[in-house]
A protein has these predicted regions:
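Conserved N-terminal catalytic core of the sugar/cofactor nucleotidyltransferase
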Residues: 1-8, 16, 34-108, 112, ...
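Conserved SAM/SAH-binding loop
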Residues: 13
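Short acidic/histidine- and often glycine-rich active-site loop of Leloir-type glycosyltransferases
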Residues: 19-20
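Structured helix-beta-strand junction loops
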Residues: 23, 101-102, 127
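Short catalytic helix/loop segments, enriched in acidic residues and glycine
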Residues: 23-38
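Conserved donor-nucleotide/metal-binding helix-loop-beta segment in metal-dependent transferases, i.e.
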Residues: 116-128
């Protein structure tokens, strides 16, 4: 079975990177000229996943604007945590409740993936 939907956790406050993350959400920080979020989305596209749910809270407008201004060739739905940050489990549950799928792969945008790891994820899906 192939997993069709990815969840990306983008709601965090990024406190460990203060003061940088006071004005820029951690997923939008750049490494080698590309944001961590864009790198994560590109990895998901390489995995041939069809849809992304992305949660937001801290500086959510910046993340929403970033997604709207990019031409990612994948369906991306933004789910805001609301008035209170839901933490990891709550954020995941909130995104799952907006989806009709049963199976997901979860990403943290601040994890950088090598091509070797992409191959390993593809192998894992063959066992799923």
């Amino acid at each position: 079975m192939k997993i069709k939907t990815a969840l990306i956790l983008c709601a965090g406050l990024g406190k460990r990177l203060n003061p940088i993350t006071l004005e820029t959400p951690k997923p939008l920080l750049r490494l080698k000229g590309i944001t961590m979020l864009e790198s994560c989305i590109n990895t998901i596209i390489k995995l041939k996943i069809e849809k992304i749910f992305l949660n937001t809270f801290h500086l959510s407008d910046q993340i929403s604007d970033f997604i709207k201004n990019k031409d990612f060739q994948i369906d991306i739905q933004i789910v805001n945590d609301g008035k209170k940050i839901l933490d990891t489990g709550g954020g995941i549950l909130n995104m799952i409740n907006k989806s009709q799928d049963d199976d997901y792969i979860i990403f943290n945008p601040d994890t950088l993936w090598s091509e070797d790891y992409i191959n390993e994820v593809n192998k894992m899906q063959n066992f799923y």
